[in-house]
Amino acid sequence: MSSVLPTPVLPTPGRNINRGHFPDDFIFGAGTSSYQIEGAAREGGRGPSIWDTFTHTHPELIQDGSNGDTAINSYNLYKEDIKIVKLMGLDAYRFSISWPRILPGGSINAGINQEGIKYYNNLIDELLANDIVPYVTLFHWDVPQALQDQYDGFLSDKIVDDFRDFAELCFWEFGDRVKNWITINEPQSYSDFFGVAYDTPPKAHALKASRLLVPTTVARPSKPVRVFASTADPGTTTADQVYKVGHNLLLAHAAAIQVYRDKFQNTQEGTFGMALVTQWMKPLNENNPADVEAASRAFDFKFGWFMQPLITGEYPKSMRQLLGPRLREFTPDQKKLLIGSYDYVGVNYYTATYVSSAQPPHDKKKAVFHTDGNFYTTDSKDGVLIGPLAGPAWLNIVPEGIYHVLHDIKENYEDPVIYITENGVYEVNDTAKTLSEARVDTTRLHYLQDHLSKVLEARHQGVRVQGYLVWSLMDNWELRAGYTSRFGLIHVDYYNNFARYPKDSAIWFRNAFHKRLRIHVNKARPQEDDGAFDTPRKRLRKY
C-alpha cells in the first residue's frame, strides 16, 4: 500500500469540474446490469437465473420482499433509456448480457434463444445509431438456474467450459460492434456473498454483507433449497467454498479471453478487463505497523485476490501464507492463460474503511472468509466516522479513498490502464416524497463532483485512468436491497409504469460532461434539448 503520494502537478477544480478538465478521449458514461433493470423475467424465451429462484424462494431475505421480475422494465423501454443516455451526452453505456436470456438452459447444447440474441442486437444497434459506445459485461451474477441445478454453478469446474461457450456466442453475435468487454463484475463480491449456498450453516453470517444493505439478522428456511450452491460436502467450510468459486471465476475469465484472442481478436479488435470492487483500506492507526500490514492484507483479500493472478499467475503472497492448501494452485497451463489476460482494469469504488490487525481464529474449522485475512474493519475511529453515511448502512462517503485506491493499483499492479466502472451513492427510497422532492439529490451531486475531482488529481499524478462510469444510470432493483435503495442519476417512478425523470445530478452531469463540451474548459453548457431534459413534471419518454 502506498504511504507517500506525489505532489499534485496541476490544481484541481473541485466542484467546478467539467469535461474540459479531461482529455478528449476520456470516456464518461453510466452503467446498469441485466437482472437489475430488464424485468421481463418470463418474456422472450428467457430461462430462470439463480436470482429468480432466490428471490422467489426467500423473499424474506430481500429488504422489501421484492424481486426482479419486472425490475424497471428496461427490456420493453430500452429505446427510452438510450434516449436518456443521448440526452445526457454520455460517451458510453455499460450494460450486461443476461446469460439465461440467450442460453435458457445455460449451455450451448441446451439451445440458443434467438429472441434473446435479437434483443441485444437491437439494443447495441440502437446505442450505435445514437453515437453511444457499448461497454458490455458478460457476467453480472445471473448464473442460469439450469447450471446451478446440474452441477452447483461456480462451485464446479464444469462451469468454465459453459462460460467460455457463452462468451464465444456473445463474441460471434455482438463482437463486430462491441469493442469493450468486461468479463466478470466484482468476482470478489460474487464469491463472498453469492457463490456459496445459503443453506450452508456459516452462510447466515455471510448474508450480513454490509455492501448489500441486508438486515442484521436473517431467518433460515425450513428446508434446504439449492439456490446459490450446494451442501453436497458438509465437511467443507463456507470459506473454502468461497475460494473455490473465486478460482473458477478466474479460470472462466481466462477461458473467455483465450477464445477471443484465438478466434476474434484479429478481426474484431476488442479490449477486455474485469470490474474489481475495492474500498480504500485505511490503517486504523497509521503509526502502528501491525495496522499498516493489516490494511495491506485487506487490500490483497479484496482486490489482489483477482488482480494478482492476472499478473503473476498466483494469488497474493499474504493469501497463500494464511490459507495454505485451502487456496487452490493454478496449473502451469492455467497460469499461461491468466497472465496478461486483460487490457485494462475496471475499478468499482464506493467507500472506505478503517482496518486494524486481528488474531487468527483458534479453530480453523470455524474459519470463515471474513476472518481469514486476520484483520478487522470498522467505519469509525474514536467515535468519529471515516466519512458521513449516505444512509442507514455501509456507504461512508470518502472521496479521497478513490485517489488512494488508484495510486495503490498503479504502484502495486504494474501501472495498468484503469476505467472507473462503478462509482456512485444511494439514497433511501422515501415514498413520502413528492416527485419534485425525490429529484433533489444534492448528496449524489456532491459525491460525484468530489470523486471526479480526486480521479482528475490522480490522473495529474500519472495514474492511467481513462474513463468514468457512474453507477447507475437509473434507479433500479438493487439486489438484496430491492427497491429500498436508489442509486440512479435518473429517478424511476416504481409506482407509475416506471416513468423516468432526471434528478439534479443528471442535469448537472449533462451540463458539465456532455460530449459536445470536449474542447474548452469554460465552454457554455449545451442548449439543444435543454427543456426536454430539464422539465421536472414531464416523463422523458415523451421526448
From Swiss-Prot:
**Chain sites annotated for binding a beta-D-glucoside:** 36, 140, 185-186, 350, 422, 471, 487
The name on file for this protein is: Ipecac alkaloid beta-glucosidase 3
From which lineage does this chain's organism come?
Answer: Eukaryota, Viridiplantae, Streptophyta, Embryophyta, Tracheophyta
Gene3D superfamilies from the UniProt entry: Glycosidases
What biological function has been recorded for the protein in this entry?
Beta-glucosidase catalyzing deglucosylation on N-deacetylisoipecoside and N-deacetylipecoside.
Q: Which InterPro entries match?
A: Glyco_hydro_1, Glyco_hydro_1_N_CS, Glycoside_hydrolase_SF
Q: What Pfam families does the record tag this protein with?
A: Glyco_hydro_1 (PF00232)
Q: Which GO terms describe its biological process?
A: glucan catabolic process; isoquinoline alkaloid biosynthetic process
What's its EC?
3.2.1.-
Q: In which pathway does it act?
A: Alkaloid biosynthesis
